[in-house]
Regions:
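Glycine-rich anion/phosphate-binding loop at the beta-strand->alpha-helix junction
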Residues: 1-111
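Catalytic-core signal marking the mid-to-C-terminal active-site face
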Residues: 106-130
Length: 130
């Protein structure tokens, strides 16, 4: 709807398509990120963006309270579909903790490492004789 409103107000304005998806932990009511459901909706969002001919935005989010193994797992579950959906812009790319309530320098380092691995994964393979 915001894309339509933007075009009504300023026709031809550049826009980027994206959504915020989170399922909820039924015990606590807290948002749960880095889940299979979030990964699937990220992929679906990328497909819709391509269908509409728009650039796509996704996020590297998690709900962990500290920088630990779970934080890494949740970030990978957010980053893989972000990369696989051919995302043009990664929002909340590094440092996000506790569902966005805080950021961490340590998590920034972990996330930058993960982003570098994703970038290297996307490099073309060389089959030259060198």
């Amino acid at each position: 709807a915001s894309l339509a409103f933007t075009q009504m107000e300023a026709p031809g304005s550049p826009v980027i398509y994206g959504g915020f998806t989170s399922n909820v932990d039924m015990k606590t009511g807290a948002p749960a990120f880095g889940t299979p459901e979030m990964a699937k909706t990220t992929l679906i969002g990328g497909q819709l963006a391509r269908r509409y001919g728009l650039p796509y935005r996704a996020s590297n989010v998690n709900a962990c309270n500290t920088v630990d193994t779970q934080a890494g797992y949740e970030s990978m579950m957010a980053l893989w579909p972000t990369i696989m959906s051919h995302c043009n812009f990664v929002k909340h790319a590094a440092g996000w903790l506790e569902g966005g309530l805080c950021a961490s320098f340590e998590k920034v380092i972990v996330d930058v490492e993960l982003l570098q691995m994703m970038s290297a994964f996307m490099d073309e393979l060389s089959f030259s004789e060198d």
